């Protein structure tokens, strides 16, 4: 009996592992409309690669690499979660909340936002000088991040 239960558990585990396989595409058409709109409104570069992350056959996330090296992650509905650009560019203004942009301009003149992560509690911003900042959802500065 133990062998049967073990075999069933192994088969079930293999099924879940197989259904979690990520897929890749070289075309923006696999992205939700919201993600395609975000890219076209904020970036000049074209989509190079789209990684579609799945768990148990369900899409969890889209990771997009653009031809200029920028990387953007979107949730299954096409809402962006984070974005990074190469160190010679800046994250597009459409990704940076007004309060965040104003704080960076006032307190870190001469730097650029090269990375931004969005989560339930707010934003984490990486500057071109390597400093990381935390902001709440309204764009108010909270602290420097380690």
Which residues fall in each region the model found?
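Bacterial Sec-dependent N-terminal signal peptides
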Residues: 1-23, 39
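Generic detector of low-complexity/intrinsically disordered segments
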Residues: 8-16, 33, 60, 68
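Structural motif
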Residues: 21, 87-88
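Glycine- and aromatic-enriched low-complexity segments, predominantly in secreted/extracellular proteins
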Residues: 22-24, 29, 146
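Short, non-transmembrane alpha-helical segments in secretory-pathway proteins
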Residues: 26-49, 91-112
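Amphipathic N-proximal alpha-helical interface segments
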Residues: 60-86, 130-146
């Amino acid at each position: 009996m133990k062998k049967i239960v073990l075999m069933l558990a192994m088969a079930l585990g293999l099924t879940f592992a197989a259904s979690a396989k990520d897929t890749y595409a070289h075309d923006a058409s696999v992205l939700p409309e919201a993600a395609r709109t975000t890219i076209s409104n904020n970036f000049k570069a074209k989509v190079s690669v789209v990684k579609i992350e799945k768990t148990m056959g369900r899409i969890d996330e889209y990771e997009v690499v653009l031809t200029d090296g920028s990387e953007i992650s979107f949730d299954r509905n096409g809402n962006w979660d984070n974005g990074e650009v190469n160190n010679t560019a800046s994250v597009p203004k459409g990704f940076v909340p007004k309060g965040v942009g104003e704080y960076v301009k006032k307190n870190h003149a001469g730097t650029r936002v090269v990375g931004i992560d969005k989560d339930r509690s707010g934003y984490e911003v990486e500057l071109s000088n390597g400093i990381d900042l935390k902001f709440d959802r309204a764009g108010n500065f909270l602290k420097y991040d380690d």
